[in-house]
């Protein structure tokens, strides 16, 4: 802030704006791929008693010009006392736990999510507070398709807008302004980078116009344009609701798959191309049968979480996010809100290390559980996609998608703690082990070939990741001294029920379980069942056998008279302590000869018999 002091001037009007040179809409075809310098921020002269202040845009958005004028108090020397940020700096930066320190979960289980501000809006000059007309869920749920990447000429402006919002979060002096800034963070992708309904120059200019308004300090126009597009989108949906859509032919579906696969191949994304070609397609949530199947996959909370959890720091620091963002995979679904990985890569391209530190600080607040409880409920909302399991299209499996920033942060937590987690899980659980899949295959095969009189049972746990009790995850992390520092991170992320949405519409909640595709899910699931797996392994080893798991895929080998009783006890403990159900009708038994007489009748034989041999 720049101050101009001097003799007492005559009374002046409350505010006088300096003239602004209007910026023309940017033609995205010109300078494509180039990073343009950020547009100059708007300055305003504000009369405050005996002096005038030149206020930058960042200060204006901290709650509006009126707050800026009236919010400060004069202290000795005539300077205003800066209001302390409500979030404050992080107190602990080193992984570990503080002796005897526990965090309460009561206010995190069902936090009240901020809604639209009731009554007339208190508008400010920048329009920053216009977002008060929207609730947090309205900001998070995105009915639009966002652009695949940030257009070259707009990269610096996207980075600038993101920086303004993050600074507003970190410096917010009260709950009202913190909530306002967090809602801006939620709505940024759809507010600025939603695809225009019109193509060509008109469409490109409309996108550029949103950024130009923000660079002119006019965030109110950004909200106004968004609300107008939302209204048009709703009207279009209502008109099309009663229409019968033409069903695509099988050849049209295959042609679409080939085009998508080819686009991935052109980018060098071979695995994505293969998955497109082998996919059986996506089911429609408008089909009542599909929706019923989808809802059955997400369960209500089966066991209450503990009242308090050991406080700990999951990671030491988050330095290096810039390099991580620069190498994020492209073409990945953005999840709830429309924030694509390409938008984060843009930040890595534009921001200097000092600016990236702002996002690192925000991310540390998230991981440490220092953001408002409602934030974890809203930001952690899961986009659900029902995919057909087979070519018959008779059954579906749900795929849950979280936004790429959450996935990146959760991946960092697991990466930094992989050694500690692996030490707890091995040798029974190989999900996090180096070349764990190879180790699992070789150990099971060697066990089968070495002991021709044994049986090997392949376990099938129903809907494992979606049904495991969250309380079991937290309990397991707290139980081991080497993983206690992760318990608080798990608790704040999992305390509130997770929202489930598709196409910007909420359709349900998930009270227990993890999200498949979330980088923390395999590790947390493995920890939840590890104590029971150890008991199973110990019972089998008493008879010479062993138990080995690759996450929820388990294999038990040993003499039949040892394996089957141990399996029954494992099944009971799994249900009582983790809320998981062993599907006996899908659990298979391998034996070189005939199945032993003591084999439970509901367990089926693995493999097939050909000329007296099992293959």
Residue ranges and their predicted role:
Residues 248, 307, 311-528:
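Conserved pre-catalytic core of RNA-dependent polymerases
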Residues 463-481, 547-577, 592-595:
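Catalytic palm subdomain of template-directed nucleic-acid polymerases
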Residues 15, 21, 27-31, 41, ...:
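Surface-exposed loop/turn segments and immediately adjacent short secondary-structure elements
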Residues 583-614:
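Short, conserved micro-motifs composed of acidic
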Residues 354-369, 440-448, 563-579, 602-611:
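Inter-domain linker/hinge segments that demarcate the starts of reverse transcriptase
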Residues 413-429, 523-566:
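Active-site palm subdomain of RNA-directed nucleic acid polymerases
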Residues 6-12, 21:
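Phospho-regulated RS/SR low-complexity segments
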Residues 375-377, 546-549, 581-584:
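Short beta-strand
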